[in-house]
Amino acid sequence: MIDVVEIQKILPHRFPFLLIDRVVELEPAKNIVAYKNVTIGEPIFQGHFPGHPIYPGVMIIEGMAQAGGVLAFKSMSDEHQAGIENKVVYFMSIDGAKFRHPVRPGDRLEYRLNVLKHKGNIWVLEGKAYVDDVLCAEAELKAMIVDK
């Protein structure tokens, strides 16, 4: 639905910190499904952990936040979409983060986020991350869209 080229028009993140490759579902102001292909070539695996590579939980949470940012931007009204290049999403809080299953090179990490609450420029999202339908991580995220 939204490829990495389009994602880069929405988010300011770039390699090695752009953590979503594609959006496969998006219902504005409701939910998003996006994924990242985790590869052994990721710079993070040089130190986490040599000989036993595990994708860090903090990177999973950041990927969720980036997917949430795409959802928030794509949920903006048409008149606000025109000024998207002058906006940025700031992470406000993470609550209830839990890491349930390790993510390894070769995994397709799928982010599923649902809007719990939205008021003005503030978004509260329930995020879950899966590999092959196995829950790997979950958290409640709060973010806001602001001018750059």
Curated annotation (Swiss-Prot):
PANTHER family for the chain: 3-HYDROXYACYL-[ACYL-CARRIER-PROTEIN] DEHYDRATASE
GO process terms (BP): fatty acid biosynthetic process; lipid A biosynthetic process
The protein's Enzyme Commission number: 4.2.1.59
InterPro entries: FabA_FabZ, FabZ, HotDog_dom_sf
Chief subcellular location: cytoplasm
A GO-annotated cellular component: membrane
Domain of life of the source: Bacteria
The UniProt record lists the keyword Cytoplasm: yes
Catalytic residues as annotated in Swiss-Prot or TrEMBL: H48
Role description: Involved in unsaturated fatty acids biosynthesis. Catalyzes the dehydration of short chain beta-hydroxyacyl-ACPs and long chain saturated and unsaturated beta-hydroxyacyl-ACPs.
Keywords: Cytoplasm, Lipid A biosynthesis, Lipid biosynthesis, Lipid metabolism, Lyase
Enzyme class: lyase
Ranges in a coiled coil: none
GO MF entry, a single one: (3R)-hydroxyacyl-[acyl-carrier-protein] dehydratase activity
Catalysed conversion reaction: a (3R)-hydroxyacyl-[ACP] = a (2E)-enoyl-[ACP] + H2O
Family statement: Belongs to the thioester dehydratase family. FabZ subfamily.
UniProt subcellular location: Cytoplasm
Organism listed in the record: Campylobacter concisus (strain 13826)
Name the UniProt record assigns to this protein: 3-hydroxyacyl-[acyl-carrier-protein] dehydratase FabZ
Keyword Lyase assigned: yes
